[in-house]
Amino acid sequence: MNGNFGNDAGDQVIRLVARCLQRLSRASDVVARTGGDEFLLILPHTDLDGARVLAERIRMDIAQRPLVVNQQRIPVTVSLGVAGAVGEAELDKLSHEASRAMHLAKRGGRNRVASLDTKPI
């Protein structure tokens, strides 16, 4: 985005994604920007299927909100990786699994939700 439309457009995308995550998450969830254009959403008391459903809602919500730059509508899409844990889990390990799943989504064609398997960590 930054390379084609400038840093302001990239910043607008970051804000769009952040607002979507805040709007669709619960008060008990944690939304964090982990750097660049990546975010982490921690969903306590949510199973892997529930996380996948929310990730798909987030993906669809963002896809329905194109960015307008210089009177040009620019589609915005996201690739989301989902990972789960039963009980307590190390945040680094969980984040790493979600990141691997996100890269799987990108390799699969972008604008997708992916998880590595159906078993939580």
Residue ranges and their predicted role:
Residues 1-22, 32-36, 40-41, 48-56, ...:
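Conserved long alpha-helical elements within nucleotide-processing catalytic cores of c-di-GMP signaling
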Residues 23-28, 60-71, 102-104:
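Short catalytic/binding micro-motifs of nucleotide second-messenger systems
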Residues 28-31, 113:
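Conserved ABC ATPase nucleotide-binding domain signature region
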Residues 30-33, 74:
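A short pre-motif secondary-structure segment
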Residues 42-44, 83-84:
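Short hydrophobic/aromatic beta-strand micro-patches
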Residues 52-55, 70, 85-116, 120-121:
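Catalytic-core segments of nucleotide cyclases and related cyclic-nucleotide turnover enzymes
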Residues 76-78:
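PAS and PAS-like sensory/regulatory domains
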